[in-house]
Amino acid sequence: EMTSSLVGSEMCIRDRDYADMSRKAANIISAQVIMKPNCVLGLATGGTPVGAYAQLVDWYNKGDLDFSEVTTVNLDEYRGLPKEHPESYWSFMHKNLFDKVNIRPEAIHLPDGTNPDAADACKKYNEIIHSVGGIDLQLLGLGPNGHIGFNEPGEAFELETHCVDLTQETIEANKRFFDGNVDLVPKQAYTMGIKTIMQARKVLMVVNGTG
């Protein structure tokens, strides 16, 4: 049984300069891949990590990075969106990173948003994370109200992957990605819990500016 104490180290990059922050985050991720080529990276979506992914792709194109043995697990995925939907996190990750580097498709893991059985989807994702040996480095972008993934502040610390109802604020904020139509915005997501995140051997939190 993995303990939920923070086994490794927690690093936080807080920087108003987005390019600087992205480079620092990419440095830490690339160091992990170089140190342990078959590492397990926990990845996140959103505006904060995009710059870091672009930097990693740049280094990959220069021949400095090799993702052929890397395994990835993503923090979260919308419930009910097909993988290929342009707003799914599966699409986001492929567009910003996976399609541009030599990662093996079978080494890419996200919660299965298409699984209608929430308990089953979460159980399977927890099993995947355990079966790959846990997370070596978990990247987190801190949201504006202090939420990590879709874990809102005050979320129970003992939770692993679980299904969450998105807050009205989150749904409203996401409207712009769905032609302004609130009916099309997913109302739930599958997300790694705080317990899962804290079991990562290293956690890298990236905070851009004040948000």
Predicted regions and their residues:
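Ligand-binding beta-strand-loop-alpha-helix segment within the catalytic cores
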Residues: 9, 65-138
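Glycine-rich N-terminal segment of FAD-binding domains in flavoprotein oxidoreductases
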Residues: 35-61
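A glycine-rich beta-strand to alpha-helix segment
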Residues: 39, 47-52, 127-155
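Short beta-strand segments
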Residues: 42-46, 74, 111-112, 139-142, ...
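A glycine- and small-aliphatic-rich helix-loop capping segment at beta-alpha/alpha-beta transitions
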Residues: 55-66, 89-91, 153-163
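C-terminal functional extensions of proteins
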Residues: 190-211
